Amino acid sequence: MLEDKKAAAKVEPLRKTRPCPECGKPSNREHYPFCSNRCREVDLSRWLTGSYAIPVADDETKADYPDEEN
């Protein structure tokens, strides 16, 4: 029983703390990778309003592909 408590005390967190992508403060486990619910909702709002976008080429023939070497 005593050994179980010692083993449980040595459990390491799954994720390393990172700075919040919005404000730079240390991240919070509950809101990972953000520091707070506010920063999490700011980021979600940006995604929902289209502030973040993944660039795509209108025509694949005009897309800038790296030269392939055979």
UniProtKB/Swiss-Prot annotation:
GO biological process: regulation of DNA-templated transcription
Residues reported in the UniProt entry to bind Zn(2+): C20, C23, C35, C39
Alphabetically ordered keywords of this record: Metal-binding, Zinc
Cofactor dependency: Zn(2+)
Coiled coil regions in record: none
MF-aspect GO terms: DNA topoisomerase type II (double strand cut, ATP-hydrolyzing) inhibitor activity; zinc ion binding
InterPro entries, alphabetized: DNA_gyrase_inhibitor_YacG, Znf_NHR/GATA
Record's cofactor remark: Binds 1 zinc ion.
Matches recorded under Pfam families: YacG (PF03884)
Family the UniProt entry places it in: Belongs to the DNA gyrase inhibitor YacG family.
PANTHER family: DNA GYRASE INHIBITOR YACG
Record-linked HAMAP family: DNA_gyrase_inhibitor_YacG
Oligomer and partners: Interacts with GyrB.
The protein's role, per its UniProt record: Inhibits all the catalytic activities of DNA gyrase by preventing its interaction with DNA. Acts by binding directly to the C-terminal domain of GyrB, which probably disrupts DNA binding by the gyrase.
Protein name as it appears in the record: DNA gyrase inhibitor YacG
Organism this protein belongs to: Rhizobium etli (strain ATCC 51251 / DSM 11541 / JCM 21823 / NBRC 15573 / CFN 42)
UniProt gene name: yacG
